[in-house]
Amino acid sequence: MFVRVGMVVALVAATLCGSPVQSVRLLDHAALLGDVPDQAWYEENIPFVDVPDTAIRDTYYYRWRTFKEALKYTGPADGWIVSEFLGPVGYSAPYGGIDAAAGHHLYEGRWLHDQRYLDDYLDYWLTGSGSGPKPATEDLNRNTTDWAHQYSFWAVDAAVARAEVSGDWRFLTDRLPALRKQYEGWKATNFDAAKGLYWQTPVWDAMEFTASSYQSDDPYHGGDGYRPTINAYQYGDARALALLERKAGDGSAAARYDGEATKLRTATEKALWDGSFYKHVTRAGQKIADREEIGFIPWYFHLPPASDAVAWQQLTDPQGFSASYGPTTTERRSPWFMHDALAGCCRWDGPSWPFATSQTLAALANQLLDYPAQSYASADDYTNLLHTYAVTQRKGGQPYVAEAHHPDEDRWIYDSAGHSEDYNHSTYVDLVLSGLLGIRPQANDTVRIAPLAPAAWSRFAVENVAYHGHDLAVYWDRDGTAYGKGVGFRVLVDGVEKVRRATPGDVTVAMPPAVVVARPELVDDAANVGETGYPTASASYTWHGDSAANAIDGQDFHLDVPSTRWTSYGSPHSSDWLAVDFGAATMVSDVRVDFYDDGGGVRTPDAFALQMMDPDGTWRDVPGQTRDPAAPWRRTVSRILVDPPVTTDRLRIVASRNDGGAVGITALQSWRQPDPRVSVSFVEPSLAVDPGRAVTVHTRVTGTTAAATLSVPRGWTFRAIAANTWQVTVPADADPSAGLPIRALVRTPRGVNSALLPTSYQFDPADYPTVVWNDDFTTDRLASYRVDHPAAEPSPRLAVSGGVLTASADSRAFAVLAAPVSGTAVVVSPASFSGAAPEDSLFLGLSGGDHDNAMVWYNNHFGTSGADVQTSGASHPEATGGCCAAVKWTPGDRFAVLSRWGKLTTWIEHDGSWTLLHTAPVTAAVPPATLASWSPAVGLRLDSGTLSVDRFTVLAQ
């Protein structure tokens, strides 16, 4: 809920107090970063590392780039989240959150200077949209009912690991109730009290097909068992909760969680340890013979006793997990090794999986640094495996991470175009910092430095580490030639040398008390991650592979595929514009533009204008601009401060190149700083509006004596009728289905607060009092209809009897009955469906004959609703509104379609209430006059059996 500090920075004062000033700089940051976009962000946010192993080093900076790409701003409610995929998937929580790798995200992101990214992200899972209700379905985990428990998730442990770096324990102790709830949630769904163990289905460990699940009757969603994963996760979370309870002063609660952890550790050791490895145990109590890489996870949480170290000999065993691009996810000696692994995703029975490699390396670092010495694994094993992991992350010689890699061949095997690129499902940065370079964060005012780097290395360095709010740096320079600041191993805090040794070693350094300074919340009023409602984006010209909406989707990265950009590639214009419509006016003071430059057909503009639209519809340059940089610069974000701020409902960037070539934008943002003391909201959660009518809205303001002002969409009017009470009038020619918002603004010397009230149209048949056709099928009027055939399919047998129209068929049949009238709304009451598959569908809408129609549909078999539009027999998907809305008809429900404002809107009535299902922008393909000439119609399509309706009504205003 803040602006990305390196994009360039919002409010200079906020930047200075928000992160420690780097006191030592011996590394060439620009050279290390290379040609990465938005270098200022990295300077403000990441530790800089130098090591002799260039594969490890280059992958380190690449993985910071992929992490930055995964940062997604969702809006003022949830702020920032960390995404797994760069594009959306159908099984995610709101805005694309997936908790499977959220623990990895928290460990990786804990090294960021700006804490607000992970503050928001933790709140998203603990109390925000990520903690919200989830369908308990087979596809989304039938055992759990909220998104934060969709997949196994070591939430509390990761939150504490992050606080060990930031030093901000108050943030977590303030959230103890939510953290307890997250931990306890697994007890309610996945705990076997009789055995004292947690069970999980491998797929909900993010492991679809495994050696475990293949030994069940359902290799994909089967294989329930007591697994090293969730039991170790819950052990780690219990220990973390105990620490937090002690921080909060509740020793009794701490002892309770410590006790639960001890019992779980004992039960896990007894049931899952076979004397040499931790294994999956079926619900029936059978320990599988196969070793899986998940058997190393207990060390990630310090669960095993020292005597279990023998397991680590499997990591380097050629018949165990060793591989050229490993480790493997199942031991080679298993008969399930690589079973079907090359047949398609997602087989975790041998492929090299970054998710698991991350856990194994973190676990190995713990074994090496936090347990007694043993003979099964060494620091060299750690460095060798980290190097292997680094070189695995390559494609075509360039840094790259996807979903899974072949263990023995230099190729990614689960790597779908537009889906798997820069897959954020693992850690790497944390493994370099906390393992290789040995920065071991602590819960007290110390830091432990215990590098695992090879003794043969003559140098390594890390600087610009934000640790407990201080600047931490570590340098090793054997002969003093690498960094020019002397010989030996040094640790510096805030520029002061705290340790100097002849060689690297395991040292604990006292730290000054942690410094936690909150940075101000900032809100991007231009962001619309869901691409529904407002704000909206438009452009003078858009290349067919891009989208104006991409520039305001809350993401900012410069990949070719997938993309989050708008470009004017192919435009005939000498300059092009990208505009944002806020729906209702807001204050504009801080605009950021990230221009896209692919080094080819799309380049950084030579000049651009920032313009606002006046009330009369004319565009003019925004006054009072100060730009940084003064002119556009390749791969550098342009920041425009506007002083004094302006209030407008529309902004645009007009960009041009001297050679007339194409331009592009990956992010257009308008940041606003709220006053943290103030709250403004609407009493109404939403507002139904209708053209030509007035409605009343109420605002609520707390924390200030300042009054709210109202902003309404263009053409709408309002007047105050009492304190915090407003009458809003919608013009007669307005489109209420557009979802335009009403905005309340409160201005104080410390910021501007805003609240949005979405408006919508609510269908009510009573608003269409003229009944132009009403067939209740008490008499046979079939001869009055025109029968159309939108598809080359025969008509079903049609009959009217007993107040019901029945369509019967033995095979696929389809007919549309067009009424001899015109109207605005069509209402149909189904009586029954056939139960056939896949076609068991009702259609309603407008028909102009066999080859011309705009019909919405409900498919009873699939429980979905959508629209079809065709003219002259040609389909027009651009006019259908996409597919599909999920809905299930029950007896007594009615369907309606409304043809107004150039759209077909589909509605269902259930228990007397009408709900919008779908919107089709039909006039994108059918001219309004043509649409008006078509006839209201009802269609019936089925594969067999009978489908019936008991009323067909056409209404007009």
Model regions: which residues?
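Non-catalytic carbohydrate-binding regions of carbohydrate-active enzymes
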Residues: 248-282, 310-469
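Secretory/extracellular carbohydrate-interaction modules
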Residues: 807-866
